[in-house]
Amino acid sequence: LIVSHAHFDHIGGARRIQDEFGAVVLMTDEDWQMTNEPAIYREYPKPIRHLTATHGGTLNLGREKLTFMKTPGHTTGVLSTSFTVYDNGYPHAAVMFGGAGLNFDGVERTQMYLDSIAFLQSLEGVEVNIPNHQDSGEVFERLEKLALREKDATHPFVDPEGWTQWLDELLAAAEEKMADEQAKR
C-alpha cells in the first residue's frame, strides 16, 4: 500500500487493510513520523510501520517499476510516484503528485510546495496525470470522455498539455498563498 501522505483521508484505512489482507505499507519517513500524532488520525488506528520510501527510490512490481519522489509541502513528506501506463500496448509516462492541496500554513511549507512544483515541472515526457483526489485533474470529465471514446482516438488521460497546465495552476495558487503567508509575518 503506497501512501502519498499521512493525512487521515489517505492513511485512515491502512491498518485495516494490513490486518485483513496482510498489506505492506510504504511512505516517507517524515510522514511515518506523523503517525505518532494522534490528532491526525481521528478515530483511525495507527498503521504498522513497514517500508520507507526515499527520493529516487524504486519498487519493482513484476516487470513494472515505480519511481518515488519526495515532493513536500502539503505535508513535509509527500510522496509522488512516476510509472508507466499502457493504452492498447503503447506506453505512456504517468505521475501521481501525492499532495496537491494547499491546506497547510507557513512560509517554509509554502516554499517547500513551490519547490516541489518546480521539480515536477522539470520532469520530461509526462503524459498522464493521476491525481490523488477525484476533484482535481478533471478525472470525472476524462472518465466521461473515455466512455465515449472512438476506436483509435487518443485516450483522454493521455494529455501532456493538461499536466503542464495543471502544474501551472497549482503554481499560481501557491504563489498567491506565499504572498498571503508573508503578509501574516
Question: Language-model features: where?
Answer:
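Electropositive, surface-exposed helix/loop patches at the edges of structured domains
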Residues: 35-36, 40, 59-64, 68-69, ...
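C-terminal regulatory/interaction regions
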Residues: 161-185
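Short alpha-helical scaffold segments that flank and stabilize functional sites
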Residues: 16-17, 119, 177
